[in-house]
């Protein structure tokens, strides 16, 4: 039976009749910036024929999914250029990542900055030549024959059915479905000039890449992210829909570098990372300690007002606790090795006369909070019970991923665990989310969206029914908030789904902040109960909640958000008083004393430095308020304000100046 000449499609929401064999290139010829198409919800190359009855949408290169395809295609062009310049280079993987892409290579020598320039220059020629990306479906035998000289591709073919768990980026190359190879095809001859094992999709032509790409750096990387594997050389790059978009991104990067909390932490004398302590273990200096204490003190106050009760737990515990909780089954790789202690041996024979025990540094506070709940009988009248702790936890992070304060090995979590009835669950989740958002706003973050992390089918405890109920409840609470909700399939911890609050900072970057996790499983594992109103014993629901994530990480984020210019209530030094000349030291010293009496952190700069240098020093230290006084000020009983932005307010009466400063601190105003 012959194929029908015409078929019906839904194209960008409109029903259309087209000829059989129509491709995305045919449909979207009038939309030259279309990167790929979405066919029944899946991304396809534009060159593919569209089946009858399909729903088809164009995806522009400026859209998030379009940018991902652009970056993936640019990674292929980069790999082609590398193999032209270094014919012996073996291909690893080359996925898109946030704002960019990378490709791994097995090469004899690391790439140099000069190499990156040559690669980039050749990429520009490939882009201008307008090579087509051609998709081919092949069987495994054909794929192995074509990839015979690419050992890493052959390894991936062997992991085809488990690519999602095979390692970093493997799922970009192969998966449980078809095996596909993408050719880069010379426009003039029609010959394939380069190919790679890849699931795609890709742009229709290299010309669509344009000139909005750049190679950023090279680094060593273990194959599939496993440090037991061979170390390869990785080239990172970024790609955007236009040169202007690339320039804007590079400007954001430069601004992010200026705001880097590691640099500012050293410049402002806030914290450091002594080699003697080890990777990921920061120490806070007095100035940083002030900020941290202010953060903690305000958080404690707000938690007290919200009905939380404070608890304290130790830093180590016997192994059995984490066997009960499931952490040793599901989280062992994130824990430090055990300490084996209390073993006794006969001094003469060396034989063990008393068995020792394994103790672990705690990676999480929840098991210990469960023990507090279980320490006595509980009644429904006590619920919801909200336990809160600034609890120190220790997590083994590979040295390569440790990063300043935002990825550490020893951290302090503002950790709360809420125990409630199922009837209270939804209201408590709503209250908790609102509390989290309000408190983050008090610290100066105001732009949020939510992410819902759901079950990893390979890594969870409890029944599917319990997970479905927990996920549904969290989704309802998140949607009721009115904030954008983004799915994160498989991103939950092993014991329950979670909402995470994503906050946008001053330069538009998104940070994961607070997490709210619903858990029916740990109460079961710890046999937690309460006596219900009808006298029966019931299982409570447990809500895990970390507001800052960790104190360390949150301080790192705030340092970059404010570029070190903290609002007055958080600033280590809130006021620096600078006399125009030494003769006015005593006058300003009296002003400083009055400010200190109001609880303001104020200092008189009576150093021997000249006046201009004192002003520069205060600006460098990012003091919120600089008070200046000379002869006219003393005669009028006034001071002059100098603000961070260089503006001044002269001749302000001392009492008014003190009142303004106290108000700014107590009302947590953002100072200029």
Curated annotation (Swiss-Prot):
Record-annotated TGS domain positions: 2-60
Co-factor remark: Binds 1 zinc ion per subunit.
Record localization: Cytoplasm
The record, for Gene3D superfamilies, names: 3.30.54.20, Anticodon-binding domain (3.40.50.800), Bira Bifunctional Protein, Domain 2 (3.30.930.10), Threonyl-trna Synthetase, Chain A, domain 2 (3.30.980.10)
Q: Which intervals of the chain are annotated as region Catalytic? A: 260-567
A GO term (biological process) for this protein? threonyl-tRNA aminoacylation
Q: Does the keyword Cell inner membrane apply?
A: no
Q: Single GO molecular-function term?
A: metal ion binding
Q: What cellular component GO annotations does this protein have?
A: cytoplasm
- What InterPro entries does its record include? aa-tRNA-synt_IIb, aa-tRNA-synth_II, aa-tRNA-synth_II/BPL/LPL, Anticodon-bd, Anticodon-bd_dom_sf, TGS, Thr-tRNA-ligase_IIa, Thr/Ala-tRNA-synth_IIc_edit
Which co-factor is required? Zn(2+)
Q: Which UniProt keywords apply?
A: Aminoacyl-tRNA synthetase, ATP-binding, Cytoplasm, Ligase, Metal-binding, Nucleotide-binding, Protein biosynthesis, RNA-binding, tRNA-binding, Zinc
Enzyme Commission number(s) of this protein: 6.1.1.3
What does this gene product do? Catalyzes the attachment of threonine to tRNA(Thr) in a two-step reaction: L-threonine is first activated by ATP to form Thr-AMP and then transferred to the acceptor end of tRNA(Thr). Also edits incorrectly charged L-seryl-tRNA(Thr).
Q: How does the annotation summarize its subunit structure?
A: Homodimer.
Spell out the protein name for this chain.
Threonine--tRNA ligase
Species in which this protein is naturally found: Micrococcus luteus (strain ATCC 4698 / DSM 20030 / JCM 1464 / CCM 169 / CCUG 5858 / IAM 1056 / NBRC 3333 / NCIMB 9278 / NCTC 2665 / VKM Ac-2230) (Micrococcus lysodeikticus)
């Amino acid at each position: 039976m012959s194929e029908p000449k015409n078929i019906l499609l839904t194209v960008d929401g409109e029903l259309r009749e087209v000829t059989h064999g129509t491709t995305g290139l045919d449909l979207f010829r009038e939309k030259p910036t279309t990167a790929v198409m979405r066919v029944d919800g899946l991304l396809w190359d534009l060159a593919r024929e569209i089946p009858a009855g399909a729903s088809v949408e164009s995806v522009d290169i400026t859209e998030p999914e379009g940018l991902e395809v652009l970056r993936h295609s640019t990674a292929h062009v980069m790999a082609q250029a590398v193999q032209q310049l270094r014919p012996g280079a073996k291909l690893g993987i080359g996925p898109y990542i946030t704002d960019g892409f990378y490709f791994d290579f097995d090469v004899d020598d690391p790439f140099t900055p000069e190499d990156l320039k040559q690669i980039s220059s050749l990429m520009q020629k490939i882009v201008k030549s307008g090579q087509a990306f051609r998709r081919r479906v092949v069987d495994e035998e054909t794929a192995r024959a074509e990839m015979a000289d690419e050992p890493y591709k052959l390894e991936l073919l062997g992991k085809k059915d488990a690519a999602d768990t095979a390692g970093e980026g493997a799922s970009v190359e192969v998966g449980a479905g078809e095996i596909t190879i993408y050719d880069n095809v010379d426009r003039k001859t029609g010959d394939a000039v380069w190919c790679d094992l890849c699931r795609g999709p890709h742009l229709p032509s290299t010309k669509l890449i344009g000139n909005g790409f750049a190679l950023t750096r090279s680094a060593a990387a273990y194959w599939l992210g496993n440090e037991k594997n061979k170390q390869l050389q990785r080239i990172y790059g970024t790609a955007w829909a236009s040169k202007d978009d690339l320039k804007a991104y590079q400007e954001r990067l430069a601004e992010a570098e200026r705001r880097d909390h590691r640099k500012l932490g050293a410049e402002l004398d806030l914290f450091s990372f002594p080699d003697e302590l080890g990777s990921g273990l920061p120490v806070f200096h007095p100035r940083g300690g002030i900020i941290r204490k202010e953060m903690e003190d305000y958080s404690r106050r707000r938690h007290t007002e919200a009905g939380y009760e404070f608890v304290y737990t130790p830093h180590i515990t016997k192994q059995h606790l984490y066997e009960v909780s499931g952490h040793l089954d599901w989280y062992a790789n994130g824990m430090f090795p055990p300490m084996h202690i209390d073993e006794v041996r006969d001094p003469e024979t060396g034989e063990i006369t008393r068995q020792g025990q394994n103790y672990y540094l705690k990676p999480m506070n929840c098991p210990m909070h469960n023990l507090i709940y279980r320490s006595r009988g509980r009644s429904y009248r006590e619920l919801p019970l909200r336990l809160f702790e600034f609890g120190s936890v220790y997590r083994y992070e590979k040295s390569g991923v440790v990063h300043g304060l935002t990825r550490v090995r020893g951290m302090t979590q503002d950790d709360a665990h809420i125990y409630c009835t199922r009837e209270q669950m939804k209201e408590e989740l709503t209250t908790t989310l609102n509390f989290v958002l309000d408190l983050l706003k008090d610290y100066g973050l105001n732009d949020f969206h939510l992410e819902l992390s759901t079950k990893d089918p390979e890594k969870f405890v409890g029944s599917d029914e319990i997970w479905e109920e927990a996920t549904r409840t969290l989704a309802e609470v998140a949607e009721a908030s009115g904030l954008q909700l983004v799915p994160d399939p498989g991103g939950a911890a092993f014991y329950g789904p979670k909402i995470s609050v994503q906050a946008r900072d001053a330069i538009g970057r998104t940070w994961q902040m607070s997490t709210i996790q619903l858990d029916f499983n740990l109460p079961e594992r710890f046999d937690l109960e309460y006596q219900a109103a009808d006298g029966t014993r019931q299982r409570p629901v447990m809500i895990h909640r970390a507001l800052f994530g960790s104190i360390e990480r949150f301080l790192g984020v705030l340092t970059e958000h404010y570029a070190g210019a903290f609002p007055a209530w958080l600033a280590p030094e809130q006021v620096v008083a600078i006399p125009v000349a030494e003769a006015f030291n005593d006058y300003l010293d009296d002003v400083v004393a009055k400010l200190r009496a109001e609880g303001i952190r104020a200092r008189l700069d009576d150093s021997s430095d000249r006046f201009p240098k004192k002003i520069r020093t205060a600006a460098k230290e990012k003091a919120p308020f600089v008070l200046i006084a000379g002869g006219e000020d003393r005669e009028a009983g006034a001071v002059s304000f100098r603000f961070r932005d260089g503006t001044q307010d002269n001749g302000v009466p001392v009492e008014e100046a003190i009142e303004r400063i106290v108000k700014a601190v107590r009302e947590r105003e953002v100072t200029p």
